[in-house]
Amino acid sequence: MKKLLSLLVSLFLLTGYCFAATTNSYDKYGSKTGSYRTNGSTVTQYDKYGNKTGSYRQTSSGYNSYDKYGSKTGSYRKTSSGYNSYDKYGSKTGSFKTNSNGVTTKYDKYGNKVGSFKTDSSGRTTQYDKYGRKVESYK
């Protein structure tokens, strides 16, 4: 849940990716893994069976994430270079930064690279692990 919401935030906020009413996610083999639906400033996440798994909502300083029951699980705060992520207690868990080429890199709380995201000309955004291996895509 936290991982997927982190991916969503990185896509939605940092790559300039514009979510349609419904955006689907796929694993590296092309099988659907879930979907995201927008309603104003709220994005709700569903698994591949259509069950709600979480959401995030815009705030004055960034975004908050919630589990499927509506309990806050974390937050994302805008910085000069991207966003920092925090757990529900306010402890920093990582960060997202976008370079001049539009590639978004995710770092853990120690500053180690843990993954990246790239969007192609068709609008498909692909997530890679720290070794450059494809993990998931969004379209």
Segments from the language model and where they lie:
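Repetitive helical segments and hydrophobic/amphipathic motifs
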Residues: 11-12
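Sec/Tat signal peptide C-region and signal peptidase I cleavage site
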Residues: 5, 15-20
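Bacterial N-terminal signal peptides that target proteins for export
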Residues: 1-8
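Intrinsically disordered, low-complexity proline/glycine-rich segments
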Residues: 19-139
